[in-house]
Amino acid sequence: MTMNLIHSSAETSPDETLSFRETIRTRRSVRGFLDNPVPLSIIREVLEDAQYAPSNCNTQPWNTHIVRGEKLRQLSRILHVKNDAGEFTPDFTFDQNDYYGEYRKRNDALGKAYYEAMNVMREDKEGRHRVGAMNYSFFNAPQVAFLFMPSFGDNVRVAGDIGMYGQTFLLSLAARGLGGIPQTSLGFFAQTIREFLGVPDELKLLFGISFGYPDEAAPGNRFRMDRVPVDTSVTLHD
């Protein structure tokens, strides 16, 4: 089903969504979802919100593919096989070892908190692989948004546009009591996903967003990461 066939028959009224401040402060990366799918009418509302994201010169370069149902289950099986075989086909390189200084510390702190919540010790390689592979079951989310983009120059500005679109998408989910998680790991299999979905080669996969109704009992949702004080990242010039 293509999105132009989805018509919203009952939009969420403004008083049914969180305030802006509540939305910003309650949004989190959800790593465990209930298996009941989000109605297509609500998915359309979220997509319409995301369409208002800013972009360089109003290019609106995002190309979003929503995958669910049997199609998503088929893709999950393929990605698990590819992951186990180490057959990665990313459009953009990514290596966590490139992080340094405070960025590395924050990355490591997240990993430690997550694996502890999942009751997996650092030396448990099999357990860590199993937990990492949950990315390719989409944390049990019944639907996933794959965010593709055209390639222009060094792609930095286009990727920035996609990031703003993704953030708007995530905030719209949060405002409705839904959850999502942006997954760089899905981009590791860009060519595989592109071929499976029939996406043209000129569109590059930056990341995907698994989303749905949060499962608050899931171990991956039992921890929270803090934010550094504003003064550590902002300089005022007066």
Can you say where each PLM-predicted feature lies in the sequence?
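Acidic, surface-exposed loops and disordered segments
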Residues: M1-D238
